Amino acid sequence: QADINRIERKAFREHARIENAVAAYTRELCARLDEQQFTKGIQLTPIPEGGDSVLVVQLSDLHFNEQVNLPSNQYNFTIAAQRLRKLAQRVKQLGASYGARKVVVACLGDFLNSDRRLDELLSNCTNRSQASLLAADILRAFLLDLREQFEIEVYGITGNESRVNKELGWSDELATDSYDLMIYEILKRGFAGADGIAFCGFRANELLFEVMGRTFLCLHGHQI
């Protein structure tokens, strides 16, 4: 019995150390975000007036942290940032053409690449804690780029590859144990109080939002 108690206490201590470390990391991250707002020192343009059009931008399966180095294709954090920059410029062009004043950004999951299989782990650029911060920084720049011309609303759901645990869960409690939610909340907290950038909702598996009388359903591909 004494051996069993010792093993149980050891397991509890190890679990408690991990939980305390994660809690401390979260507190420190929140404190830093509160100190350094994403719009600090940036003069945001006035929210556009008039214009009836609204653009919907879908961000899905960005798979930040994946590294591809093939003759026919390359992908890493730098290329991902360049592609989002190009997308923002295209959105601005369309917005000017249609007289849009608002952009709704629908984040449909899998911001980060999986690391559950050996080939995925070997092809990733860094660990997923660091990758989540890099991803948030790239998405911050993307949203600020769009904010130069539009009012912004952001919605989000989880994907399947960005989940923290190996098992795929469907309940809200399990499905939101995801780097997708973490990145969304980092952005939400960093942009808190920013004029013209609103984070309007995040759900585990599906989400509905309305634009100009039309209802949009957000789903990730593994549910279709």
Where are the language model's segments positioned?
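Extended recognition/assembly regions associated with phosphoester-bond processing machinery
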Residues: 1-224
